[in-house]
């Protein structure tokens, strides 16, 4: 692939890690953010120490506070901003874009107010004549590992397979590999909903439960993610892939996962507001729990783990009692899909 110009919107941990992947591939990378000290640090010290204390970025990776500068003459735009501001940033991008670009996102969540997937938001806010079909970049990927060039395999999903193949070529190298998929619904719901299950798995750890319990919540969590996804129109096979079970494993078992760490802290009895303040990063699984619970209620989808986490976070229920309460639920077949 010839050298491409890519704007990455959101210089958080994942946006920064992906900027390095693209830079390693010889592309021109521009990070955009709205925190002056962070932008200055990236440009002058070539570090982003809030997320990576010991990593020095290549000097070719630049950052700017000016969205117009970031978008000038780019071939592709990657959204890696928190779910709750995706629509706002997309509107700002739409007001500036003056040429067609490949639009990608690598965030994992559902919009709280509308319950919409992020690709839908981008499609609504950015005119079709200025963008490709949206490409979703998702899968089992800790930024802490990608930034040190550990082997990582993820998915590029789009309704337009050629757009997905473009992104596959853009990112893939000797340590970072993408597989294409056309099931955007499946990939996005898997990426968003696994954060809820990671909170549950972390809570079990914080409560002192062992591997049996954690394996159970991850496995049954995959079942309820799949139930809801299929109801929304996803291909069930997607949940057996990198963006499904792969992402669920990496997020539901690792201390690198902010959702797992948040769940562990909840299990230890810490207050949510203290957890969010101490972590200093967005915990997408908290907001997604509410959205998923509301969707499940509307569609009549059985999601006991999501319900237990929802009641603990939003209704003040004791998290241990909520989780143990699932042990007395109605007997079911393992393969029920409703």
UniProtKB/Swiss-Prot annotation:
Keyword line: Cytoplasm, Lipid biosynthesis, Lipid metabolism, NAD, NADP, Nucleotide-binding, Oxidoreductase, Phospholipid biosynthesis, Phospholipid metabolism
Major subcellular location class: cytoplasm
Gene3D superfamilies in UniProt: N-(1-d-carboxylethyl)-l-norvaline Dehydrogenase, domain 2, NAD(P)-binding Rossmann-like Domain
Binding-site list for sn-glycerol 3-phosphate: 108, 139, 141, 194, 247, 257-259
PROSITE patterns with a match to the protein in the record: NAD_G3PDH
GO molecular function: glycerol-3-phosphate dehydrogenase [NAD(P)+] activity; NAD binding
Binding site for NADPH: 13-14, 108, 143, 258, 282, 284
GO cellular component: cytosol
Localisation: Cytoplasm
EC assignment: 1.1.1.94
Reactions this protein catalyses: sn-glycerol 3-phosphate + NAD(+) = dihydroxyacetone phosphate + NADH + H(+); sn-glycerol 3-phosphate + NADP(+) = dihydroxyacetone phosphate + NADPH + H(+)
Keyword hit for Cytoplasm: yes
Gene Ontology biological process terms in this record: carbohydrate metabolic process; glycerol-3-phosphate biosynthetic process; glycerol-3-phosphate catabolic process; glycerophospholipid metabolic process; phospholipid biosynthetic process
Pathway: Membrane lipid metabolism; glycerophospholipid metabolism
Keyword Magnesium among UniProt keywords: no
Catalytic residues in the record: 194
Cited InterPro entries: 6-PGluconate_DH-like_C_sf, 6PGD_dom2, G3P_DH_NAD-dep, G3P_DH_NAD-dep_C, G3P_DH_NAD-dep_N, NAD(P)-bd_dom_sf
Job description of the protein: Catalyzes the reduction of the glycolytic intermediate dihydroxyacetone phosphate (DHAP) to sn-glycerol 3-phosphate (G3P), the key precursor for phospholipid synthesis.
Stated family: Belongs to the NAD-dependent glycerol-3-phosphate dehydrogenase family.
Name of the protein this chain belongs to: Glycerol-3-phosphate dehydrogenase [NAD(P)+]
Organism listed in the record: Streptococcus pyogenes serotype M1
């Amino acid at each position: 692939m010839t050298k491409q110009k890519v704007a990455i919107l959101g210089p958080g941990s994942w946006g920064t890690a992906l900027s390095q992947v693209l830079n390693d591939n010889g592309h021109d990378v521009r990070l955009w953010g709205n925190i002056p000290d962070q932008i200055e640090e990236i440009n002058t010290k070539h570090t982003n120490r809030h997320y990576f204390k010991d990593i020095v970025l290549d000097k070719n990776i630049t950052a700017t506070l000016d969205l117009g500068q970031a978008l000038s003459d780019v071939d592709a735009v990657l959204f890696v901003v928190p779910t709750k501001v995706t629509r706002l940033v997309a509107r700002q991008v739409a007001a500036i874009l003056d040429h067609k670009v490949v639009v990608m996102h690598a965030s994992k969540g559902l919009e709280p107010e509308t319950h919409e997937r992020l690709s839908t938001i981008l499609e609504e806010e950015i005119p079709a004549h200025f963008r490709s079909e949206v490409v979703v970049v998702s899968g089992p990927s800790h930024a802490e590992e990608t930034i040190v060039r550990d082997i990582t395999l993820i998915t590029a999903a789009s309704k337009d397979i050629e757009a997905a193949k473009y992104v596959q070529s853009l990112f893939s190298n000797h340590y970072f590999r993408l597989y294409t998929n056309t099931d955007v619904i499946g990939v996005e719901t898997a990426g968003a909903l696994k954060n809820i299950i990671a909170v549950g798995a972390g809570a079990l750890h914080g409560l002192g439960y062992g591997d049996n319990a954690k394996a159970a919540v991850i496995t049954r969590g995959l079942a309820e993610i799949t139930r809801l996804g299929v109801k929304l129109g996803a291909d069930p096979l997607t949940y057996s892939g990198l963006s499904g079970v792969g992402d669920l494993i990496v997020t539901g078992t690792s201390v690198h996962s902010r959702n797992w760490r948040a769940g562990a802290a909840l299990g230890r009895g810490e207050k949510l507001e203290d957890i969010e303040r101490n972590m200093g990063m967005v915990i997408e699984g908290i907001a997604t729990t509410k959205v998923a619970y509301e969707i499940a209620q509307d569609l009549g989808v059985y999601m006991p783990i999501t319900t237990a986490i929802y009641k603990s976070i939003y209704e003040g229920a004791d998290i241990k009692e909520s989780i143990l309460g699932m042990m007395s639920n109605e007997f079911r077949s393992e393969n029920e899909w409703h």
